[in-house]
Amino acid sequence: MKLVQVQHPLVKHKLGLMRSAEINTKKFRELATEVGSLLTYEATADLETEKVIIDGWCGPVEIDQIKGKKVTVVPILRAGLGMMDGVLEHVPSARISVVGMYRDEETLEPVPYFQKLASDLEERLAIVVDPMLATGGSMIATIDLLKAKGCKHIKVLVLVAAPEGIKALEAAHPDIELYTASVDSHLNEQGYIIPGLGDAGDKIFGTK
């Protein structure tokens, strides 16, 4: 599995702000979008381009365009919605595929409850977004679902990842790519990432 920890100073700065215990919902939500955007920039660096001729202001001009790659953004409900707009800033024509997964607080296992996927998944690059990669259970289950529907090219974007989740994801899906702003220390007994961000879903949606 390709693992990329994005080292850009802006990513480090913005993620650091998100770790504050004093951060409010508005600021956390804005930063989740911004870091999601920066991760997307890194994750799409290998998209193929092709030369095309267009009519410029002074006549025909040769430009580079993305070579017809179909993309679907896959936010894992609910917290993944907080990163979705950051991806769409760069690929605004992407289709949106929604997967509902929540983690049972006792077993820590993923429980699926909703899916609405784009058509032609076998032809699309799926960019799966979720702020936290903790145990990896929800992410693995989501990728299982995408592959079962024919998707072959998958990239995962998370704000923070625990070593335990990375190891589990690599064991289950060694062919995907993982982009993260930080590889954190470990999971605590409750399955939360340390130091992490707290409950990203609650912070994005202003709930407890």
UniProtKB/Swiss-Prot annotation:
<dbReference type="InterPro" id="IPR000836">
    <property type="entry name" value="PRibTrfase_dom"/>
</dbReference>
<dbReference type="GO" id="GO:0000287">
    <property type="term" value="F:magnesium ion binding"/>
</dbReference>
<feature type="binding site">
    <location>
        <position position="199"/>
    </location>
    <ligand>
        <name>5-phospho-alpha-D-ribose 1-diphosphate</name>
    </ligand>
</feature>
<dbReference type="GO" id="GO:0006223">
    <property type="term" value="P:uracil salvage"/>
</dbReference>
<keyword id="KW-0460">Magnesium</keyword>
<comment type="pathway">
    <text>Pyrimidine metabolism; UMP biosynthesis via salvage pathway; UMP from uracil: step 1/1.</text>
</comment>
<keyword id="KW-0342">GTP-binding</keyword>
<dbReference type="InterPro" id="IPR005765">
    <property type="entry name" value="Ura_phspho_trans"/>
</dbReference>
<dbReference type="InterPro" id="IPR034332">
    <property type="entry name" value="Upp_B"/>
</dbReference>
<keyword id="KW-0808">Transferase</keyword>
<feature type="binding site">
    <location>
        <begin position="198"/>
        <end position="200"/>
    </location>
    <ligand>
        <name>uracil</name>
    </ligand>
</feature>
<dbReference type="InterPro" id="IPR050054">
    <property type="entry name" value="UPRTase/APRTase"/>
</dbReference>
<dbReference type="GO" id="GO:0005525">
    <property type="term" value="F:GTP binding"/>
</dbReference>
<feature type="binding site">
    <location>
        <position position="103"/>
    </location>
    <ligand>
        <name>5-phospho-alpha-D-ribose 1-diphosphate</name>
    </ligand>
</feature>
<dbReference type="Pfam" id="PF14681">
    <property type="entry name" value="UPRTase"/>
</dbReference>
<keyword id="KW-0547">Nucleotide-binding</keyword>
<protein>
    <recommendedName>
        <fullName>Uracil phosphoribosyltransferase</fullName>
        <ecNumber>2.4.2.9</ecNumber>
    </recommendedName>
</protein>
<feature type="binding site">
    <location>
        <position position="193"/>
    </location>
    <ligand>
        <name>uracil</name>
    </ligand>
</feature>
<feature type="binding site">
    <location>
        <begin position="130"/>
        <end position="138"/>
    </location>
    <ligand>
        <name>5-phospho-alpha-D-ribose 1-diphosphate</name>
    </ligand>
</feature>
<comment type="function">
    <text>Catalyzes the conversion of uracil and 5-phospho-alpha-D-ribose 1-diphosphate (PRPP) to UMP and diphosphate.</text>
</comment>
<keyword id="KW-0328">Glycosyltransferase</keyword>
<dbReference type="GO" id="GO:0044206">
    <property type="term" value="P:UMP salvage"/>
</dbReference>
<dbReference type="GO" id="GO:0004845">
    <property type="term" value="F:uracil phosphoribosyltransferase activity"/>
</dbReference>
<comment type="similarity">
    <text>Belongs to the UPRTase family.</text>
</comment>
<feature type="binding site">
    <location>
        <position position="78"/>
    </location>
    <ligand>
        <name>5-phospho-alpha-D-ribose 1-diphosphate</name>
    </ligand>
</feature>
<keyword id="KW-0021">Allosteric enzyme</keyword>
<dbReference type="InterPro" id="IPR029057">
    <property type="entry name" value="PRTase-like"/>
</dbReference>
